[in-house]
């Protein structure tokens, strides 16, 4: 019985027999894969660089039904992710393809792209780029293309995604992010503060928000 498979693409907290506790986006590997890779015929869970075989785990706490991943760590899905953003925002496919390609394998810096996955399906995503098509080049970098599929709205997915992105960028040394939007009252829920009105490249004024963060993300060892 593959009792750990249900935790694939979720966010969990794992307690180990060593007494250590880890939390983060979780992926499941089957016994056949682990036999080939590690000569251990057991199922396992992965959080970032950490691997937990079933015998290592004393407790699993499900934190969220979905998981957030940086696209830089998921190069095999780059075309699927590119198409997902293109279909939501109708910006030319090649523009997304070029930006997403630039982030692959990059452990720091801009651009970065992120997706939220539930049951092997992308349900939300956003990016971090230098400038989201506005005149204030000094307000950088910018969170852009924030989108949650309609079936998954009002479930905390947007806040989950935004916090992950802010924490991940802070771990890279980028603790201040900006976001251009026409929404009022939405981003304030997640710790963003209104900064100023900014004119976009289309000549229209939009609201600029700022978020400051010093936390770290990813797989976290909780001692």
What do these predicted ranges mean?
Residues 66-81:
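A short beta-loop-alpha structural element at the N-terminal edge
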Residues 131-143, 153, 201:
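A conserved beta-turn-beta hairpin within the catalytic core of GNAT-like acetyltransferases
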Residues 171, 175, 181-205:
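Conserved active-site alpha-helix within GNAT-family acetyltransferase domains
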Residues 86-118, 127:
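Active-site rim helix/loop that mediates acceptor-substrate recognition in acyltransferases
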Residues 115, 121-131, 142, 147:
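Conserved beta-strand in the GNAT
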Residues 145-148, 154-167, 179:
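Conserved acetyl-CoA-binding loop-helix of GNAT-fold acetyltransferases
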Residues 136, 149-160, 172, 189:
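Conserved glycine-rich acetyl-CoA-binding loop
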Residues 1-65:
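Conserved RNA-binding domains used in RNP assembly and mRNA/RNA metabolism
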């Amino acid at each position: 019985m593959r009792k750990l498979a249900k935790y694939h693409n979720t966010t969990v907290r794992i307690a180990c027999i060593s007494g250590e506790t880890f939390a983060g986006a979780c992926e499941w590997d089957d016994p056949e894969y682990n036999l080939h890779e590690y000569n251990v015929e057991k199922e396992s869970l992965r959080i970032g660089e950490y691997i937990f075989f079933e015998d290592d785990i004393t407790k699993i706490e499900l934190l969220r039904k979905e998981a957030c991943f940086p696209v830089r760590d998921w190069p095999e899905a780059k075309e699927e992710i590119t198409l997902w953003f293109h279909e939501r925002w109708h910006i030319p496919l090649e523009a997304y393809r070029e930006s997403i390609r630039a982030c692959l394998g990059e452990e720091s810096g801009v651009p970065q792209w992120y997706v939220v996955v539930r049951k092997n399906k992308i349900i939300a995503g956003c990016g971090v780029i230098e400038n989201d098509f506005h005149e204030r080049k000094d307000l950088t970098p910018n969170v852009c293309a924030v989108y949650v599929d309609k079936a998954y709205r009002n479930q905390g997915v947007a806040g989950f995604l935004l916090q992950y992105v802010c924490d991940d960028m802070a771990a890279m040394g980028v603790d201040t992010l900006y976001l251009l939007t026409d929404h009022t009252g939405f981003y304030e829920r997640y710790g963003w503060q209104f900064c100023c009105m900014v004119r976009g490249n289309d000549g229209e004024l939009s609201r600029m928000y700022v978020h400051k963060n010093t936390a770290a993300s990813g797989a976290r060892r909780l001692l």
